[in-house]
Amino acid sequence: MASRTIIGIDPGTNLLGFGVIRVEGRKAVFVDMGVLDLRKDKSPHAKLRQIYETVSEVCKTYHGDEMALESPFYGKNAQVILKLGRAQGAAMIAAAEQGIDKVFEYAPRRAKEVVTGNGAASKEQVSIILQNTLGVKFDDSHPLDATDALGVAMCHFYQ
């Protein structure tokens, strides 16, 4: 069975997380994860450009085959949903331009439920489960936005 690479994205306009796994047969292997920190930039247009450029680079570097995105969750105010939707759109366009035409969306509760068995799991709980599942140790250089993105990638792997 051929391997494939899944790129998980936790879109945000302040912090955008990404997580990359490689699927080998029936096993997921940790590749990388990180965060794009957008808090210093006040221009929404500049933030979207940075999201696009970063996601493009991640897709190109890791030769992504599929992308799993955390969808904006309901209950936040309309302005927040709109901003998150724009960030998600920038990531989707970046993926498409890098040849990734398989893009899947998962609600945060669904991703947590699939990964941990509990849709209300904390970010810390998700991180612990991912470390155990993937056999890696995360430290403070791996912000929780990155582990959220990795969780979305793992959610897609389990589907």
Give the location of each predicted region.
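Phosphate- and other anionic-substrate recognition elements at nucleic-acid/protein interfaces
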Residues: M1-Q159
